[in-house]
A protein has these predicted regions:
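Short solvent-exposed strand-capping/beta-turn motif centered on an Asx-Ser/Thr pair
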Residues: 36-41, 86
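Solvent-exposed, conformationally flexible loop/turn segments
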Residues: 13-18, 61-67
């Protein structure tokens, strides 16, 4: 079974919790990097949940700034990545490895 580097999420945030990615059947994912980019002139808050459990909870990202987090979080078949922010001018970038 090959390990494949993969972009899981490249999406603008919603202001209520929304599913950004679901692990495909017969796959396991390791999330290795999360970036939250605020493109507004004011600070925002953002949250990321792995399988409905808060991983990043209401973190503040400054105006026109990016939060970058390295991690090694395993997600199994059908588990989800969800996210939301206080503004829709926030972008989530989440990548890792799929096998």
């Amino acid at each position: 079974m090959a390990n494949v580097a993969k972009q899981f999420v490249r999406a603008a945030a919603a202001t209520s919790s929304a599913t950004l990615y679901t692990v495909p059947a017969s796959k396991t994912n390791i999330v290795t990097n999360i970036s939250i980019t605020n493109t507004t002139a004011a600070a925002i808050t953002a949250s990321i949940l792995f399988n409905d459990v808060a991983y990043i909870a209401a973190v503040t990202v400054g105006a026109n700034d990016t939060l970058v987090m390295d991690t090694k979080t395993v997600l199994s078949t059908t588990q989800t990545i969800k996210g939301f922010a206080s503004s829709t001018s926030v972008n989530f970038h989440i990548s890792g490895v799929e096998f």
